[in-house]
Amino acid sequence: SVADSDDPDLTVVNSGAYWTLYYNSANGEYSLRMFGNVPSSIPSAWKSYLGNIKHIEIEEATLTGSFEAYFKSKIDGFRVLESVRIERSNLSGVTSFREAFFSAGIEKVIIRDNDYPTAPSLLTTESMFENCYNLTEFDVSGLDTSAVTNMKKMFYNCRTLEELDLSNLDTSSVNSMNSMFGYCESLEKLNVSNFDTSSVNDMYHMFRDCKALEKLDVSNFDTSSVTNMGGMFVNSTSLKELDVSNFDTSSVTNMSALFSSCRALEKLDVSNFDTSSVTTMLAMFVACNSLEELDVSNFDTSSVTTMQSMFFECSSLEELDVSNFDTSSVTTMQSMFEKCTSLEELDLSTFDTSSVTNMQSMFINCAVLKSLYLDNFTTAKTMTDMFTGTTSLAYLFVSHNLQSFYGLANTNWYDEKNWVQFSNLSQLQTYHRNQSEPTGYRKGTFLSLTMDAMGGQFDDAEEQKVQSKISGEYWEEVIPVKEGHYFDGWYLDQNFTNKFDFSLPATVSATLYAKWVENYTVVIPASISLNEATELKVEGINRGDKNLSVGLNRTATSVSESNKLTLANTADTTIQCLAPLSWDGSENNPKNAILTLAPGSEITEGEAVLAIEAPENIQAGTYTGNLVFSINYE
């Protein structure tokens, strides 16, 4: 700073009506002090010293006119200036500070405690501190900006500035804040919470590359007059919180790159955005890598002409509802969803692409996208790599007016409706070009399972049923019915040695055969010899849902009412004898069934014994007789 004039190291080098130039022999620095009526022109007497002056103090002075580029670093200007202090001065007559400190190596600017005896005349501070790479200390509390209309690039590229409190800056008349804080890469604190932005129409790149900002309070911004928000927060890579929910965007026409590369932003509420006037959404949400949710369902896109790279690299988004988008005016969708690596489904069935000429890389590297609906898409002039990298895409429902599938996996696909199989992409595209309506295609090889009921029937009375699946899916087990029989499973062979396992995924086409077992089984010995045995065992198995009973058929056998079997001599059938029969329950009821098996939750089995008493005191010879049994299942 300018030292006290009584400093013994300080020597007056030159002076004028409103200025004094000092040389400090202790540090070899030149300083300039101004006072009184200071004009906006630089006197020729300074010419030989401009390259040496490091400090300027303006105190108790009256400044008048345009100070545009006054302190600017240039060949014929202040080339080594480090600090400027303007205090206790009348600044009412200053009309411009445009580029006042542009590209200066200045480290410190203090403008405070100044007077405005009349209304301020200052209209522009455009680029006032642009490219002040070394600026670290800053105070403009004494600068009345109430009449300023242009603050474009005011702090642009102040790369080392870490903190900026502009809470008292009057912005009520400002029209342009274009790039106002652009490339303030080290800015960690920025207070703009009291900004009156009611007159602002241009916020293009306002906070561009404010890479160190984690918080920014713009919740009170009045954006009702803003038409340009292009790149407003672009590349503010550390920004974690941003409340724009109250933004009035009804006048905005440009939202290109609005939130581009806001990589740390985890939440963003744009659900109330009025986008009815917007014509470009180019790269609007590019590389918003941390956003897991984004509600754009209310966006009015009827005026939008470009959606290029709109959601490019929104890699954490798992869902995205764009079903209400009016895309009838859009001409380019290039890279619109490129690298949306968490999106599993995308429904663009309502998209009107009749005006679109460029779909290049539209879905490129959407690596987990499984389902894609393009019901109304039409062929665009440029479609290179449209589907490249959609390695997980398993379902594509697509308009017949979209003729080419550039980059789609060259593998097995099939028409899900007509079950037409394609072994490569070329076959698929050839087939699709002959379609007359939107068609759904699934990735994979479809398989068929033919189920032969083997004399049985399915619910539809058919004896055969065919299922169609793709590799990896699971077959459905369908059970047929057959009168008087029990279903014993599906087999891969008609010898019923290889039972089919429905718990395994489908891998090949196959034919299955139904195995049937009669609902019941009754086992009765064909013959017995009374010389060797006096009992006949009756065995039964009930597999069905009815009662099984086994008894004597009295109309077809020679058994008396008292259960005696007639045996005849084989040599002379007129010689006969009786063999008494008995079984459990026959004493009280001679007609009682020999064996009864009721149905159960599982297969039931049982047996009964029919006792045959050998006749005595009969004529010698061989005797035979027949027993006929009746089986009832009801």
Set out the residue ranges of the language-model regions.
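Secondary-structure capping and domain/repeat boundary segments
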Residues: 445-518
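Extracellular/surface-exposed low-complexity segments
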Residues: 1-18, 393-449, 489-491, 516-518
